[in-house]
Structures are given as structure tokens and as C-alpha cells.
A protein has these predicted regions:
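FIC/Doc superfamily catalytic core
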Residues: 1-127
Length: 127
């Protein structure tokens, strides 16, 4: 099995800028330490599966509020890219994914395991 690939801070900052350009929002990084912590959480060795690592990444990026604006967009985009980098993709309707992110991850503060279960249910190998 090949080593798991992870996004860098530089890549996430570039993606954040691209998302703000496309969808609007206030630019700015609020807390580099929170961004760094979110990106390193999946690498901690605590999360056995790719779904669990993706869940930790999504949860941390969405809830740490490292950016002034666009945290949820970045969280979902980076998680999707992380999965793609590692040979998988999320297959969920946009409305369903948005509802899960806002209602479960943000508002209900779903556990990392609940998020991992949702990701696992929507995960497909990339061909």
C-alpha cells in the first residue's frame, strides 16, 4: 500500500484564495496555528482508515475557523482533494453534502466517527 498523501498549508492557502475569487468572501487567515493543527490532525496516527482521516480533516477545518471567511468551503474542498489524492472520491449530491456539513458537522457538532461513517457511505474509488 502506498503512503497517504496530504495537502500542504501552501496548497490550502492557494485553494482558499481560489474559492474566494470564485464564490466571494472576505480574504484573510485568522490563525495559522489552527490551520496547521487541522492539517496535521489526520496524520496523528490515531485514525486508522482514510475515511477517519478525512473526517478528522473535515471536522477540524470546518470548526477551527482558521480563515476570516470560507471555512466550510475550504473544509469540504480540501477533504475532497485529500480523498482524490489517495484514490477515492465522495459521491454525494451537492445539496446532501451541504446539508450534512452545515446541519451535522457545524450545528450538531457530529463526532469524528459520525463524520467518518457518512464519508465511508459516500466514498468511491477513482478509476
Amino acid at each position: 500500500m502506498s503512503a497517504t498523501l496530504y495537502a500542504t498549508i501552501e496548497e490550502v492557502l492557494m485553494l482558499h484564495s481560489m474559492l474566494l475569487t470564485r464564490y466571494g468572501g472576505e480574504p484573510g487567515l485568522r490563525d495559522l496555528g489552527m490551520l496547521d493543527a487541522a492539517l496535521h490532525r489526520p496524520r496523528s496516527g490515531y485514525y486508522a482508515s482514510l475515511s477517519e482521516q478525512a473526517a478528522a480533516l473535515l471536522q477540524s477545518l470546518a470548526n477551527n475557523h482558521a480563515f476570516v471567511d470560507g471555512n466550510k468551503r475550504v473544509a469540504f474542498a480540501v477533504t475532497g482533494i485529500f480523498l482524490r489524492m489517495n484514490g477515492f472520491a465522495l459521491r454525494a449530491a451537492t445539496d446532501d453534502a451541504e446539508a450534512f456539513l452545515i446541519d451535522k458537522v457545524i450545528k450538531a457538532r457530529a463526532s469524528a466517527q459520525q463524520i467518518a461513517d457518512w464519508i465511508e457511505a459516500h466514498l468511491r474509488p477513482v478509476r
